[in-house]
């Protein structure tokens, strides 16, 4: 399974690539997408330099923008520090993965063959998560973006 390791402050890029399962976005291209996204949103070019991702709900964030650029059409939904996350996201069968974030880092959980795997660019190994471990893990996260593929 693809596992891109940490390089500089590109954890958001690693999270997207790890979720997709291949190096879809080189670092230089990720920087360009950040700059484009900031200009579209009249922001002072903060996505690339400050690792900010401007979350206005749904797909209107750097993750939705980049996933659309690589033709991965999906629906994103964001939750913050929510102990009831599992009841709110519903059945995980419809979810393809998660982008997990806190103030300092971003990583992903990816579904492969109907099983979830924690893929963190700062960790040495990929960690499989059964439904119980997934539920426990998500309850402890500061921020979660669910990913549901519409078409690819």
Where are the model-predicted features located?
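Active-site nucleophile-adjacent alpha helix/oxyanion-hole segment immediately C-terminal to the catalytic cysteine
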Residues: 1-53
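Amphipathic alpha-helical interaction motifs in eukaryotic regulatory proteins
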Residues: 12, 16-17, 34, 38, ...
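Conserved active-site-adjacent core of cysteine acyl-enzyme catalytic domains
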Residues: 42-103, 112
């Amino acid at each position: 399974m693809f596992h891109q390791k940490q390089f500089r402050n590109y954890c958001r890029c690693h999270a997207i690539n790890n979720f997709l399962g291949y190096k879809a976005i080189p670092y230089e291209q990720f920087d360009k997408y950040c700059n484009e996204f900031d200009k579209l949103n009249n922001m002072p070019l903060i996505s690339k330099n400050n690792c900010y991702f401007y979350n206005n709900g749904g797909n209107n964030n750097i993750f939705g923008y980049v996933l659309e650029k690589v033709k991965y059409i999906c629906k994103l939904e964001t939750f913050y520090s929510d102990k009831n996350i599992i009841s709110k996201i519903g059945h995980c069968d419809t979810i393809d993965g998660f982008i997990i974030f806190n103030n300092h880092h971003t990583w992903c959980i990816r579904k492969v063959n109907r099983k979830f795997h924690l893929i963190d660019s700062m960790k040495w190994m990929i960690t499989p998560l059964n439904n119980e471990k997934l539920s426990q893990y998500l309850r402890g996260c500061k921020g979660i973006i669910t990913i549901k593929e519409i078409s690819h």
